[in-house]
């Protein structure tokens, strides 16, 4: 089975259609797999630079505050113990790497599932370009996207050389623009609709379909 979507122009006309291979856009989504991949992707974004000081790292506290016996108070060896104000932290966070190793096949399968979910709900769109001409226009791009979907969160996938399109949508709230080689599960699931330029869609299909890989 092969899905088809109409290719729209900024003028609002239909310029043919493009096929969405079933192997990429009509697979059964694996919810658990997509969750695992997205969790790993978000974990990898964490800086992990958080740090607290233990009682051995806090400045001061080298002298025993008072004698061991005879004061009537509990024995203390340092004013930098965790029960004191200004003392060290017990089991506090230290710098660490949160990234997880996720096999490439799992990442690719999760992306196929996410795209298939959007395709089944008619939330994948194809366009010739975002604006006509060689002059960026945020107003024109916003109007054009509004004709494609009423949803606010849109993922735009265009070629790396399409600077006019990138400049036209980069300041639009709720719109995230990436190139086809940057396509990932989180961005697809985080967006309500995915808008491909024909160039970007063909690039993704040729790079990931079995037919494209054999060419």
Swiss-Prot record:
Task: Give the span(s) annotated as Disordered.
Answer: 43-100
InterPro entries xref list: Ribosomal_uL4, Ribosomal_uL4-like, Ribosomal_uL4_dom_sf
Choose one Gene Ontology CC annotation of this protein and give it: ribosome
Domain of life of the source: Bacteria
GO: which molecular function terms?
rRNA binding; structural constituent of ribosome
Pfam families associated with the record:
Ribosomal_L4
Q: Which UniProt keywords apply?
A: Ribonucleoprotein, Ribosomal protein, RNA-binding, rRNA-binding
GO biological process annotation, one example: translation
- Family that this chain belongs to: Belongs to the universal ribosomal protein uL4 family.
Subunit and interaction comment: Part of the 50S ribosomal subunit.
Q: What does this protein do?
A: One of the primary rRNA binding proteins, this protein initially binds near the 5'-end of the 23S rRNA. It is important during the early stages of 50S assembly. It makes multiple contacts with different domains of the 23S rRNA in the assembled 50S subunit and ribosome.
The family database entries (PANTHER family) matched by this protein are listed as: 50S RIBOSOMAL PROTEIN L4 (PTHR10746), LARGE RIBOSOMAL SUBUNIT PROTEIN UL4M (PTHR10746:SF6)
Protein name in the entry: Large ribosomal subunit protein uL4
Species assigned in the record: Mycolicibacterium smegmatis (Mycobacterium smegmatis)
């Amino acid at each position: 089975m092969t899905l088809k979507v109409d290719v729209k122009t900024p003028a609002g006309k239909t310029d043919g259609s493009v096929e969405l291979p079933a192997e990429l856009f009509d697979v059964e989504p694996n919810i658990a797999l997509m969750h695992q991949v997205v969790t790993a992707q978000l974990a990898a974004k964490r800086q992990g630079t958080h740090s607290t000081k233990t009682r051995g790292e806090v400045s001061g506290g080298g002298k025993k505050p008072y004698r061991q016996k005879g004061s009537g108070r509990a024995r203390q060896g340092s004013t930098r113990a965790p029960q004191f104000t200004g003392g060290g932290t017990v089991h506090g966070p230290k710098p660490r790497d949160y990234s997880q190793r996720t096999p490439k096949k799992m990442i690719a399968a999760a992306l196929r599932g996410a795209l298939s979910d959007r395709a089944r709900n008619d939330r994948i769109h194809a366009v010739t370009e975002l604006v006509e001409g060689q002059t960026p226009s945020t107003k024109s791009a916003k109007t054009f996207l509004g004709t494609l979907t009423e949803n606010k969160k849109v993922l735009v996938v265009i070629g790396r050389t399409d600077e006019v399109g990138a400049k036209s949508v980069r300041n639009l709230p709720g719109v995230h623009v990436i190139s086809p080689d940057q396509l990932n599960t989180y961005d697809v699931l985080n967006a309500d609709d995915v808008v491909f330029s024909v160039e970007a869609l063909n690039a993704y299909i040729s790079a990931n379909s079995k037919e494209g890989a054999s060419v």
